[in-house]
C-alpha cells in the first residue's frame, strides 16, 4: 500500500533514492509486500555487489529506523498516494486485474470493494498511520536475510550483527 510506495515501491521511494541514487550502492533496490488475511510479509530486494552487501543492509536498517522516528510530510505523502491512485485506476482497465482484485476482496472482505471506495481509503491514509505501521511491523530483530551468489564470511557476519541490532 501507501507505506510500500513511500519506502521502496517506486523510483522516487526512500530506498531507491538513498541506496541507488545517493549512495550508488545497488543496481536494483525495491520493496514489496505479500498481504494475507491474518498475516503478511514485507520484502526488500536488492541487487548488489557482494562486497557492498553489509553496507547496503546497514543503509536499509538506518532507513527503517528513520521511518519509525520521523513522519513523512503531507506533500511527500500526497505524491505517493496519488501515484497509487493512478496505478489503481490504470489496473481497473484490465479485466484480468479486476477479476483478481474482486476475488481477493471476496476472500478478505466478503464482497467486492468499489474502486472509488478503495481510492478514498488510500487518500485517507495519514503520515502518523504510516509511522505507526513501521513501528509495529518493521522489527529488524525478526528480519531474515537471503543471499543468492557468493557472500564473503566477513560480509555475512556483519549482516548478522546488523540484524541482531549491533
What is the predicted function of each stretch?
Residues 1, 130, 145:
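Short, conserved catalytic/metal-binding micro-motifs enriched in Asp/Glu and His
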Residues 1-14, 121:
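His/Glu-based metal-binding/catalytic segments typifying zinc-dependent metallopeptidases
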Residues 11, 52, 155:
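Short phosphate-engaging motifs
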Residues 17-125, 140-149:
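M16 family metallopeptidases and their MPP-like homologs
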Residues 125-137:
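A short, acidic, amphipathic alpha-helical segment used as a generic capping/interface helix at domain edges
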Residues 140-166:
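Proteolytic maturation boundary segments
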